[in-house]
Amino acid sequence: MTSATIPGLDTAPTKHQGLLAWVQEVAELTQPDRVVFADGSDEEYERLCAHLVEAGTFQKLNPEKQPNSYLALSDPSDVARVESRTFICTEREIDAGPTNNWMDPAEMRGIMTDLYRGSMRGRTLYVVPFCMGPLDAEDPKLGVEITDSEYVVVSMRTMTRMGRAALDKLGDDGFFVKALHSIGAPLEPGQKDVPWPCNDTKYITHFPETREIWSFGSGYGGNALLGKKCYSLRIASAMAHDEGWLAEHMLILKLISPENKAYFIAAAFPSACGKTNLAMLQPTIEGWRAETVGDDIAWMRFGKDGRLYATNPEFGFFGVAPGTNWSSNPNAMKTIAAGNTVFTNVAKTDDGDVWWEGLEGDPQHLIDWKGNDWTPESGEKAAHPNSRYCTPISQCPTLAPEWDDPQGVPISAILFGGRRKTTVPLITEARDWQHGVFIGATLGSEQTAAAEGKVGTVRRDPMAMLPFLGYNVGDYFAHWINVGKNADESKLPKVFFVNWFRRGDDGRFLWPGFGENSRVLKWAVERIEHKADGKSTPIGIVPTAADLDLEGLDVDPADVDEALAVKPEEWRAELPLIEEWFEFVGEKLPTGLKDEFDALKHRLSEEG
């Protein structure tokens, strides 16, 4: 078909010539049966969900258990982000840096153009306009995703401000990030579709300099919902570097003291380290309350008053299901219970509800994530470890009224944290901004199921951004340092380093975590207010057990002491690992971080 004969191309609801030319170019290349501009309406959502049920992609769940909610089971080969197939294609290889896969942009465009040729035959090409962050922001960040996946269209409606309003905001000549996605599964006439079409060949490619994303072969989450990690972190981090702001893999939490004073906290943890749990914290200490601004991504820029303000660019939660339950995260469960959720790769109960490992209940029979019968004797997990729920943020019972404020919220503290059995104390305060950047830059965490790789080994994950950097990691560290240098130091957030996951010699968790983490945050807030003590150690300022509010907490004081312990011999063992990491970062490592490393070595040597 030529573009003139592809239905829908001639009835586009926009006069934006750049957008129309791009849609026409992609349609001519990919050869869809029709072109549809998504409007983001309820009616469209219901129509697409009904289509997905008919196609076998969605199963409608019991409306009494999960109102207006669906279950999708993916192809077993398409279950997580594929870091090995994720590329940053800058003109110069050094600008992508050592943490990213790189290919020459012209070569990559050639390879992927061949893959896209005819890839949407037999399918519909959807044009999905969206905005990351509030539509009424001073500088709204707009994007358009072209996709042949209805699963993507309905998920983008939940995860972003998608549809007619975003298209109107774009106007006739506004800038937008081009995000092209195809599952790579063309249908010949009469060919029967499969419930989860995808392609064995996968590419998730970013062109930071031209602000473009090309994704092929995967229908799963972060590979296909291109507003999420691809735009909000990889492309946005490059934009932020050029424009003087920060795009970070961080939750945003509002903590309210008994005196009704609000503190906004941003926290960077690698995937599956409790970001969503902390974002929806239920404090266990009397008089303290918490509200949610975001659970995954924070865009931070300086306000007119010199403080750092953060916005959550997302519109929904795309959370890991396993481990989420009524005790670990009751607010996530309430958000899900309100309905309007798409579950992916969880198990299904006999009465049309969902189940996953860690959820209350003791089911004797399920249909597992592969569509097979499951019983407790099956010997494998019923839900995939990276199974997900995709749910509107507006349903969260702890949602802060400021979540949608185009100005953002002023950040008082930044936390970095990972999953470490040893070495790293429950909380450490950085000495200053540059020391805080060093802490973030050397963050280590044990591998999780959210990405490919061996589970349990410690990998460096700087600022929890290792898989999400859109440019050279050394330039990124320098950007963080410069953000601090260019600011009024008295107005910068304090930086803390947390580890909820430290274990004793017998393998037990030393700290109960979850809602009890409010006690740790209380100490951080009191440090901001100069009301709490801490002990200077080689790695920073660490509280003693007496400095924490442990009232009403049933925990052995010796365990708290152990959770807070700074053991010089463990840190000396950490030094060569940090050195190895900095060598990997290479020539662009800022001297400020080398200075911090030398200072840490010196302080540890003085400990004897």
UniProtKB/Swiss-Prot annotation:
Subcellular compartments: Cytoplasm
Predominant subcellular localization, coarse grouping: cytoplasm
GO BP annotations listed: cellular response to glucose stimulus; gluconeogenesis; glycerol biosynthetic process from pyruvate; oxaloacetate metabolic process; propionate catabolic process; response to lipid; response to starvation
Binding site for Mn(2+): 229, 249, 296
Residues noted as binding substrate in the record, renumbered to the chain: 81, 220-222, 271, 386-388
Complex formation: Monomer.
Protein known as: Phosphoenolpyruvate carboxykinase [GTP]
Organism: Mycolicibacterium smegmatis (strain ATCC 700084 / mc(2)155)
Gene name in the database record: pckG
